[in-house]
Amino acid sequence: MRHRGKVALVTGGSSGIGQAIACRLGREGAKVAIADVAEAGETLALLRESGSEGFGARCDISVPGEVASFVSQVGARLGPPQILVHSAVVQFVRPFEELSLEEWRRTQTVNQESMFHLLKAVLPEMKAGQWGRIIAIASSTFFVGAPAMTHYITSKGALIGLVHGLAAEVGPFGITINAVAPGLTRTKSADATLPGDLFRQVVALQCIKRNGTPEDQAAVVSFLASEEAGFITGQTILADGGQGRT
């Protein structure tokens, strides 16, 4: 049980990659808290089925007060978070010239600014405990590009910069911070919103000739959250089947 006794906070854990991460950490022994604007009942049920302890509440992570309140609730229910995974995301396709300022701001606020609020809330306890694992879910689009997604790519690039910069500040306290950059991943949401031929086109560009799954990303996150990954920090791991290899 790789994460036995640890408390993990996962944003965006009600579905998709976030749900797979929450369930993987739970199966490997962590107590899992899920922060999401959507109902997390399905994920909590999956955690219970696997014998894992979970807690979830609606939380708009773009609002500092809601983040602070949620982290306080997690501390009272499960203990202070030792693992933070930021997976919540605003993602849509829109050409830059058609993008409204409100859409731009919402994307930046949820995808990257919310990480500021989360870190402010969890870092004091991590530093006091001299241990922590922080993982931001970025995107391979920062490396390979994607049409009509400049707003999204910008927000994910900011997370990569945060990881690179903050690693030096938190490292002396036994805390690592890394990013995982998924390639195109087959989720229910992606299936519902993206054309099927896009998946085939991306597979053709990959070294590994299959669609990526949420479980692929969860496996990388689980490793980075473990004791074994204690000497890895400030890094962005591309989990994209080799599409973005350099």
Indicate residue ranges for each PLM-predicted region:
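Alpha-helical segment proximal to the catalytic Tyr-Lys
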Residues: 124, 168-169, 230
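Short C-terminal tail/terminal secondary-structure segment
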Residues: 144, 222, 233-246
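Substrate-binding pocket helix/loop in short-chain dehydrogenase/reductase
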Residues: 95-96, 103-105, 190, 202
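Active-site helix of classical SDR
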Residues: 119, 155, 163
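Short, small/polar-rich loop/turn modules that mediate ligand/substrate recognition or access, typified
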Residues: 171, 176, 232-234
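Conserved glycine-rich cofactor-binding loop
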Residues: 7, 14-15
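Residue(s) in the substrate-gating loop at a strand-loop-helix junction
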Residues: 139
